[in-house]
Amino acid sequence: MTIVRAGLIVLATLAVLVAVVAGVGMMLPRDHVETRSAKLPADPDAVFAAIADVGSYAAWRTSLSAVEVLAPVNGRARWVDVSGGDRIAMEQVERQPPRRLVTRIADPDLPFGGTWTFELAPGEGGTRLTITERGEIRNPIFRVVSRFVFGYGATMETFLDELRAHLG
């Protein structure tokens, strides 16, 4: 077998693989809803203060390398989460201290988008925080990666772990 023929076989195999992944992604739903919950060792006021103060995220969210706080628009907090080379514009769309906070991805050019709804309930010795992600994944290949590699709830689980560590 010549090098050219071997190269063509490799390229054809990769093309078929990409086509299969894209086909599977097109069969997966664009939208999803995922929920995670945790009991945290702080009262609802302290938990709400931590999740609503996006300017302090970089100090305790180890998954972020920086947070760029932007000027509010229509009274809504806006910021950019920076993680390595990735930048995700965010905004708060609903704020009801200390019970509920809703944030959303504010960049329509990303292959994904959606909201996180934080619901806080007082509990014995702390707060029960529930995060509900209502997401959409526009790119079929990214749907496959999100569903089968990362999992829809991975970022929420990381957030809850970081918040728990921050609150002590």
Role assignments for model-derived ranges:
Residues 33-35, 85-90, 112-117:
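Short, surface-exposed coil-to-beta transition loops
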Residues 105-158, 163-166:
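Beta-strand/loop substructures that line and gate deep hydrophobic ligand-binding cavities in soluble
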Residues 53-104:
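Extracytoplasmic/periplasmic/luminal assembly and interaction segments
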Residues 1-2:
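N-terminal Lys/Arg-rich, disordered targeting/topogenic segments
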Residues 44, 48-54, 67, 89, ...:
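Extracytoplasmic/secreted envelope proteins and their assembly/folding machinery
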Residues 5-71:
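Hydrophobic ligand-binding cavity/cleft-lining segments
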Residues 41-44, 93-99, 119-128, 165-168:
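A short, structured loop/turn motif at beta-sheet edges
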Residues 27, 80-82, 107-109:
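Short Gly/Pro-enriched turn/cap motifs at secondary-structure boundaries
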